[in-house]
């Protein structure tokens, strides 16, 4: 492990809202995935979606899914992707048997929250929201995402822990605190 990964794992494990800022391909995914998996195992009675991992594109979420699955499935943690390419049979299965970790994007979250679908009710059990590539959520898109996050906070029965990951974020702490509406700790990678 790199020093920043150890620090991030510790902070996320303690329940802190964390920004993981490190270069591309330096192990940011492991830095948030390992403590989330540990939390799921610790709360083994957990029913419903425990964590939502948001990626800016379907391609990136589909690329990350096998990597996340490799860690999770060995210890019985279910991980599913729900996006525009998820077929009706898979969608029904996700709604009827919610995974521990759900991989999606903000467009899907917005649509289902807005239309109050069965899928949106799955989100009420969420305890951790991970936003990868957080730097893309700036400008008008970022303000829309801020309001999606506010709606998520309203429907969740738990206080949500926020984790952001990015390789390139100018003034990352201020940016993420505005995006999520909470105080955040920053962990820097080399």
Please identify what each model-predicted range represents.
Residues 170-172:
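Canonical AAA+ ATPase core
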């Amino acid at each position: 492990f790199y020093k920043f990964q150890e620090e991030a794992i510790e902070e996320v494990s303690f329940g802190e809202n964390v920004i993981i800022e490190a270069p591309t391909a330096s192990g940011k995914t492991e830095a948030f995935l390992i403590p989330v998996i540990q939390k799921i195992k610790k709360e083994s009675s957990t029913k419903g979606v425990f964590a939502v991992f948001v990626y800016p594109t379907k391609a990136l979420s589909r690329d990350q899914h096998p990597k996340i699955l490799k860690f999770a499935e060995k210890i019985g943690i279910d991980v599913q992707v729900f996006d525009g390419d998820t077929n009706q049979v898979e969608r029904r299965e996700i709604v009827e048997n919610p995974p521990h970790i759900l991989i999606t994007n903000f467009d899907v979250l917005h649509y289902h929250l807005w239309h109050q679908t069965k899928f949106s009710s799955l989100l009420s059990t969420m305890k951790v929201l991970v936003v990868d590539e957080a730097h893309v959520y700036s400008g008008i898109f970022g303000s829309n995402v801020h309001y999606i996050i506010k709606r998520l906070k309203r429907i969740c029965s738990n206080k949500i822990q926020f984790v952001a990951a990015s390789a390139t974020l100018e003034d990352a702490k201020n940016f993420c605190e505005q995006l999520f509406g909470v105080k955040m700790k920053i962990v820097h990678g080399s």
